[in-house]
């Protein structure tokens, strides 16, 4: 099982043949990993506070699946390797068919 925690109390989980997005510990999206079709990445650099409270680097990934679910996820840039590992697992599940 692979998982990565993101912003807004969200988590992505790849567990065998299933991919799931959780928010606050509750499942919001659960789809077969083999239905994965692609991902779009965006790097974000933004201010933390309203009045110059420092900057933070984030990565946003949008995942597309057969049948319509589109999953957006935002995490610290330091977690990019964890996200890439989940995407590699989704790619291998897709090509295993």
Placement of each model-derived feature along the sequence:
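Short, compositionally biased strand/turn segments
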Residues: 5-25
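Acidic, Ser/Thr- and proline-rich intrinsically disordered linker/docking segments
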Residues: 1-3, 7-8, 27-97
């Amino acid at each position: 099982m692979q998982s990565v925690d993101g912003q807004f109390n969200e988590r992505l989980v790849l567990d065998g043949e299933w991919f799931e997005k959780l928010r606050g510990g509750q499942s919001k999206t659960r789809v077969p990993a083999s239905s994965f079709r692609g991902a779009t990445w965006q790097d974000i650099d933004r201010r933390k506070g309203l009045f110059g409270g420092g900057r933070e680097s984030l990565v946003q990934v949008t995942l597309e699946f057969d049948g319509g679910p589109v999953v957006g996820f935002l995490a610290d840039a330091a977690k990019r390797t964890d996200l890439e590992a989940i995407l590699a697992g989704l790619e291998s599940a897709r090509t295993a068919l």
